[in-house]
Structure formats: structure tokens, C-alpha cells
């Protein structure tokens, strides 16, 4: 029997994930959910295995019913909704994935990461499910590349990473993902 996957968020990232999942033979059903119900239904209508639903992710109780019978939830929502999605996934015992570590656990990103890697890591273990945060380009891909490089060197004390996601075009390009998140990233002080 194939997998049932909930994709929360039907923006650029969620749409891309849903379209890719639609091509996977081991995926039987995709639930596309968003605050913009029309966008969720439009995306679902363009796929073979999907259904579209409304979901206000600021209310964890609206996420939980969508998780019924799911094997995985892919959180492609703005970072502020991450805590609700993680808590709903833990409650429903559904595997969790996101593209960037969510907000809402602590007042700084660093404290949030310590809490996710500590307390929430234990919660995922206790629930018997997997929680994978930061699987986008940064964090995510660059961390995998850095880790893979470690096998080729004798020792390493520090790895510094710098991310620049330049977009070259002859005409104005709107933000390539969430303008709110992009502006928040630009406003952050270096760590």
C-alpha cells in the first residue's frame, strides 16, 4: 500500500513538493491544504492523486484531522506556523518534514534550534516517528554537502557557511519565496 502525505502550504515550495509526490509510484494520496482554499483545490485538481482542503494552521485543531491516516506531513508554510504543525504531527504520530527550522518555540533562532534538537528530538523518539527540520537549501543541502566533505579531510574544527541565493533576470523578479521570511532573514543579525 502506498503512502498518504499531507502537504501544508500551496505556495512555490508546497506546490513543487506536491507535483513531485504525484509522480512517485509509492505515494497513493496527497492532501494539499492551505488557508487559501481555492489555491489548495486548484493545485489538487492539477494532480492525479490529490485532494485540496482549507486549513488555518494558526489553529492546531484544524491541522490534526488532516493528518488522519497520513504517513508524513510536509510543512511548506511560513515559519510562524511550525510549532503548531510539529505539535499536531507529534499528537497524531505522523512523520514530519520542513524546509527551515520553525519559529515559535523560543525568542531567538539559536534557542529554538537547541530546543528542537534537545526536547523535541526526545518527543519524536518517544512518539516513534521521525522529525526532519531544515531540509531546504539552507539549512539542508549545504549541511549534507559539508558533512559529506568531512570524509575527505583529516580534521576540522569549524565549518562556516555563507548563503547567497541570487536571482539574475532582465526584468524585476518578485521574491522567490515568502517575502515576509525573506525580509526577516535579511534583517537578522549575523550569528
What residues fall within each predicted segment?
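Rossmann-fold cofactor-recognition segment
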Residues: 47-59
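Rossmann-fold NAD(P)-binding glycine/threonine-rich loop
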Residues: 100-129
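Hydrophobic/small residue at the entry helix of a nucleotide-binding pocket
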Residues: 13
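Conserved Rossmann-fold cofactor-binding substructure of NAD(P)-dependent oxidoreductases
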Residues: 56-69, 81
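Active-site-lining helix/loop region of Rossmann-like oxidoreductase modules
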Residues: 8, 151-191
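N-terminal Rossmann-like NAD(P) cofactor-binding module of classical short-chain dehydrogenase/reductase
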Residues: 67, 71-76, 96-98
Amino acid at each position: 500500500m502506498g503512502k498518504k502525505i499531507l502537504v501544508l502550504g500551496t505556495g512555490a515550495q508546497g506546490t513543487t513538493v506536491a507535483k513531485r509526490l504525484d509522480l512517485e509510484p509509492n505515494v497513493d494520496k496527497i492532501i494539499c491544504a492551505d488557508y487559501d482554499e481555492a489555491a489548495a483545490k486548484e493545485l489538487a485538481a492539477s494532480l492525479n492523486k490529490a485532494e485540496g482542503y482549507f486549513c488555518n494552521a494558526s489553529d492546531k485543531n484544524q491541522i490534526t484531522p488532516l493528518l488522519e491516516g497520513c504517513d508524513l506531513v510536509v510543512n511548506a508554510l511560513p515559519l510562524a506556523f511550525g510549532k503548531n504543525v510539529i505539535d499536531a504531527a507529534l499528537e497524531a504520530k505522523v512523520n514530519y518534514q520542513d524546509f527551515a527550522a520553525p519559529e515559535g518555540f523560543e525568542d531567538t533562532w539559536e534557542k529554538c534550534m537547541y530546543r528542537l534538537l534537545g526536547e523535541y528530538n526526545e518527543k519524536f523518539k518517544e512518539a516513534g516517528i521521525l522529525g526532519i527540520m531544515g531540509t531546504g537549501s539552507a539549512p539542508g543541502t549545504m549541511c549534507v554537502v559539508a558533512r559529506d566533505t568531512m570524509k575527505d579531510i583529516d580534521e576540522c574544527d569549524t565549518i562556516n557557511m555563507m548563503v547567497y541565493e541570487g536571482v539574475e533576470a532582465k526584468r524585476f523578479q518578485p521574491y522567490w519565496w515568502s517575502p515576509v521570511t525573506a525580509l526577516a532573514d535579511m534583517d537578522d543579525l549575523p550569528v
